[in-house]
Amino acid sequence: MVKFNLLFALLITPLVCFGQNAYDYYGEKVQLEAHYFQSQNAGKLQGDKKLSYQGMDISNGYAVSAQSTGVITVYDLNGGDMSKEKQLKLSTFSKTANAYNVSFGTKKMTEEDVLPLLYVSGNHGVLNVEQIEKKFKNVNAVQTITLDAKFSKIDWAVDADTGFLYAFCTNKNGTHQIMRFNVPEVKEGEVSTVKLKTSDALDNYLVEKYYQGRSMTSTHGVYVHDGQLYITSGNGTPNDASRLYVWDLCGKMLRNVIDLSTATRDELKACSVHNGELYVQTQSSMYKLIF
């Protein structure tokens, strides 16, 4: 039986009850559907076997799974199963390119597009905005966004509920910064460059100022849902287990740390919500946690 350990903020030890693949937990609620969850394997990833998996997001029943070099695979989740639809290359595709985090925005470039614009966190903190054309025919560059501050890594995510753009930044000393911006405007038929300044941030704070618990090491991707920032971390090893941190963006506090080390010994790369279920991507498969 798969067993989950949940750790909560303020170093509270949780009480966990186990049933038929359903796991009850106590503490602050992960705000999806209920105060318990089930775990299911949604399917094996079918991308390029030679490349590592990175970011993932879901919109309109389609999951876009990104890999190093800028290859993306589109999966159709509408039929209940995870079926491969198309494999494409981002406009930034190259041998050294990365798509550490991918996040759907709130705007489509054209009415015919099935998916909203895709915000791709690449090398050196650069954020590339991409249009996936209707019927997944091609991927086009729309905008390049940079930030005037230097960090070891920046994972960008759009909050589909509020329309704000979040930057989860890793400092050189291992601490983390959260910044919130308005989403820069895009125009059809125009590829633009936007240079954000730290002074443009609507909010900017150090996570460790509000939280002194378990260090967030080996963070991979971020996702915003219902006022909470989901942070995937860990390499799936005994010394660096796969964990999902849930950060309250309004209260500026850690709500949960979900330990998935016994569910998967793989890297936990990305997550996204679809039909009230939290899909998580590892280096081999997609799982869904049904809350």
Question: How does the language model describe each region?
Answer:
Residues 48-59, 95-115, 151-163, 215-225, ...:
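Structural signature of eukaryotic scaffold interfaces centered on beta-propeller domains
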Residues 62-65, 111, 117-120, 164-168, ...:
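Conserved beta-propeller blade signature
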Residues 67-69, 107, 121-124, 168-173, ...:
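Short loop/turn segments immediately following the C-termini of beta-strands
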Residues 267-291:
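Blade-level signature of beta-propeller repeat domains, shared across WD40, Kelch, NHL, RCC1
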Residues 205-249:
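Loop/turn-rich, solvent-exposed surfaces of beta-rich toroidal or solenoidal domains
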Residues 40-70:
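Beta-strand-rich domains and repeat architectures in extracellular enzymes and scaffolds
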Residues 70-76, 124-133, 173-183, 238-246, ...:
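Structural motif
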Residues 22-48, 85-97, 135-152, 190-216, ...:
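Surface-exposed loop and turn segments in beta-propeller and other repeat-based domains
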